[in-house]
Amino acid sequence: MFISPLLKWYVKHGIRVTKICQVVEYTPVQCFRKLGEQISDTRRAGDTDPNKTILGETNKLTGNSMHGTTATNKEKHRKIAFCNENNVSRCVKDPFFRQCNQLNDTTFEVEMSKKTITLDLPLHIACFVYQYANLCMLEFYYDLMDTFIDRRDFQYCCMDTDSAYMGLSADSLEEVIKPELKHRYQSEKHNWFPRSDAPEHASYDKRTPGLFREEYRGDGIVALCSKAYYCFGVEDKFSCKGINKRLNNINTNTYMDVLLTKRSGNGTNRGLRSVDSTVCAYLQERAGFSYCYSKRKVSTASLDI
């Protein structure tokens, strides 16, 4: 399913729609505009007043997390029960039984489907949010980068929902703008990046949704897959979703070994978990450095130096 703004962009850039299965008509209303403005204003206040920093960070968390819940697939929810040998056979015969794992000689973990599932989440909210994010990233690449910069002067390394890591043939983006398009770029720059003519404008636009800003600058990057990359330079920056950064010795070689050997790497997680009225310590080995990247077409050359 495509939202109409994204579909219009696809058609404008040459994609031909040959079949339409269903159309859902709606009346566009900016129902969350006040909430978005409130979050942006609170974050701006947190930038200028140290006493309001915690409010800015709290609103950042709210803005980044509130739409994700609406995309939850409740049909995949399961009920987990722990039982002994005497009760496991009764659970297996239950029509809602899905699978059983033996934890030790006397304890079994049984997974059951829920008897009733209430599908009451507004899925269209998550659909619009994520597809608008997709539209912003497409516009940034094709309408800005690919228009104003020669493809020999930049190369995308990895991309996420709201960020893109790329290599440039110069020290800054302005230096690789096509000479014949520099005047046009300066006149349209404010549509993509925060204004730089005055400090107060830059501070205000820093928290304006839809504008891009430089998040990191370094010497290189090892990008394995989504949320698994290592940037190195004056100050290193890395991401390893699902792996505890404090418990594992993570450096450039951790990612390079996966890239060169084509074998996923593991990490260790340790912590406490509450089960019923008991607190248990756990030690988990997890494959957090994956080599496989199936979401996008990747370059045949693993290394580009």
Tell where the protein language model's regions lie, with residue ranges.
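Conserved acidic
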Residues: M1-I305
